[in-house]
């Protein structure tokens, strides 16, 4: 008997990692971006409210500048992010326009959610965009985000950013697309016996012990950051699905309740 998941998905946040948008050799995966635009546009046309949290600014910037490695110096990283974000949003605008879907860009820092006035204003911006049938595309403002002793502006990674956005705007579901099929009970790259876990109701210390590793060469997120995002969603009575973003049309399967990836909550 086929298992069908019960999901609430009126308002959905989709987080796409750099590994989905940029090939391992550093070139831009235009096919994946086009599929993402197609899926999200279809969701909007069917009445769902969708916010896209997109990584990739530095990865796209490296490609644009013909560089193979992320620079180590913060000013150089932030310069690459500024270049890449401009190119990335231009690609998104072009691809979404094919499907007659308008987009709007929001570049955020953590302190926006800390201070009441800016917090209130950014939530109003999200609501206004969604009301006008516009898809907000969100990224951390890497060009200015830094952590200082008395003033934190960085989210740390877009896994955390996506969960913070989702819980603040009252999203039912966070779909996190990455370069892995879901959450395993071991490292599938090192252990052939590792099993994909289809459903995790609660993220606890045992779950964290199963996780490990860091992000890709072009990204920053690892499994631990994804678990923290899932924990945040569960605490807010939401759900999160972690799935492989190699083919973004997997989102259709997720919304149909098919048991792909790992459901948290």
Swiss-Prot record:
<dbReference type="InterPro" id="IPR001048">
    <property type="entry name" value="Asp/Glu/Uridylate_kinase"/>
</dbReference>
<dbReference type="InterPro" id="IPR036393">
    <property type="entry name" value="AceGlu_kinase-like_sf"/>
</dbReference>
<feature type="binding site">
    <location>
        <begin position="178"/>
        <end position="179"/>
    </location>
    <ligand>
        <name>ATP</name>
    </ligand>
</feature>
<dbReference type="Pfam" id="PF00696">
    <property type="entry name" value="AA_kinase"/>
</dbReference>
<protein>
    <recommendedName>
        <fullName>Glutamate 5-kinase</fullName>
        <ecNumber>2.7.2.11</ecNumber>
    </recommendedName>
</protein>
<keyword id="KW-0067">ATP-binding</keyword>
<keyword id="KW-0808">Transferase</keyword>
<dbReference type="InterPro" id="IPR019797">
    <property type="entry name" value="Glutamate_5-kinase_CS"/>
</dbReference>
<keyword id="KW-0547">Nucleotide-binding</keyword>
<keyword id="KW-0963">Cytoplasm</keyword>
<comment type="function">
    <text>Catalyzes the transfer of a phosphate group to glutamate to form L-glutamate 5-phosphate.</text>
</comment>
<dbReference type="InterPro" id="IPR011529">
    <property type="entry name" value="Glu_5kinase"/>
</dbReference>
<feature type="binding site">
    <location>
        <begin position="220"/>
        <end position="226"/>
    </location>
    <ligand>
        <name>ATP</name>
    </ligand>
</feature>
<keyword id="KW-0641">Proline biosynthesis</keyword>
<dbReference type="GO" id="GO:0004349">
    <property type="term" value="F:glutamate 5-kinase activity"/>
</dbReference>
<dbReference type="GO" id="GO:0055129">
    <property type="term" value="P:L-proline biosynthetic process"/>
</dbReference>
<feature type="binding site">
    <location>
        <position position="158"/>
    </location>
    <ligand>
        <name>substrate</name>
    </ligand>
</feature>
<dbReference type="InterPro" id="IPR005715">
    <property type="entry name" value="Glu_5kinase/COase_Synthase"/>
</dbReference>
<comment type="similarity">
    <text>Belongs to the glutamate 5-kinase family.</text>
</comment>
<keyword id="KW-0418">Kinase</keyword>
<dbReference type="InterPro" id="IPR041739">
    <property type="entry name" value="G5K_ProB"/>
</dbReference>
<dbReference type="GO" id="GO:0005524">
    <property type="term" value="F:ATP binding"/>
</dbReference>
<feature type="binding site">
    <location>
        <position position="15"/>
    </location>
    <ligand>
        <name>ATP</name>
    </ligand>
</feature>
<feature type="binding site">
    <location>
        <position position="142"/>
    </location>
    <ligand>
        <name>substrate</name>
    </ligand>
</feature>
<dbReference type="GO" id="GO:0005829">
    <property type="term" value="C:cytosol"/>
</dbReference>
<feature type="binding site">
    <location>
        <position position="55"/>
    </location>
    <ligand>
        <name>substrate</name>
    </ligand>
</feature>
<keyword id="KW-0028">Amino-acid biosynthesis</keyword>
<dbReference type="InterPro" id="IPR001057">
    <property type="entry name" value="Glu/AcGlu_kinase"/>
</dbReference>
<comment type="pathway">
    <text>Amino-acid biosynthesis; L-proline biosynthesis; L-glutamate 5-semialdehyde from L-glutamate: step 1/2.</text>
</comment>
């Amino acid at each position: 008997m086929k298992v069908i998941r019960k999901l609430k998905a009126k308002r959905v946040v989709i987080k796409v990692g750099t590994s989905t948008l940029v090939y391992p050799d550093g070139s831009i995966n235009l096919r994946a971006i086009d599929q993402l635009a197609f899926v999200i546009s279809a969701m909007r046309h069917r009445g769902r409210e969708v916010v896209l949290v997109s990584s990739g600014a530095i990865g796209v910037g490296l490609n644009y500048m013909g560089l193979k490695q992320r620079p180590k110096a913060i000013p150089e990283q932030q310069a690459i992010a500024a270049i890449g974000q401009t190119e990335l949003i231009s690609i998104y605008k072009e691809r979404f326009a094919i499907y007659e879907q308008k987009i709007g860009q929001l570049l955020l820092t953590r302190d926006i959610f800390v201070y009441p006035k800016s917090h209130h204003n950014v939530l109003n911006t999200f609501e206004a965009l969604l009301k006008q049938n516009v898809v907000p595309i969100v990224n951390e403002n890497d060009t200015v985000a830094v952590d200082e002793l008395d003033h934190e502006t960085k989210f740390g990674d877009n896994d955390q950013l996506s969960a913070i956005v989702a819980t603040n705007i009252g999203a039912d579901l966070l779909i996190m697309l990455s370069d892995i099929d879901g959450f395993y009970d071991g490292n599938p790259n090192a252990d052939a016996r590792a099993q994909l876990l289809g459903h995790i109701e609660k993220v606890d210390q045992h779950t964290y012990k199963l996780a490990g590793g860091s992000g890709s060469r072009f990204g920053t997120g690892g499994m631990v950051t994804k678990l923290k995002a899932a924990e945040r969603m569960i605490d807010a009575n939401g759900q999160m699905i972690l799935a492989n973003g190699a083919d973004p049309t997997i989102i259709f399967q997720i919304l149909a309740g098919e048991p792909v990836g790992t459901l948290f909550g």
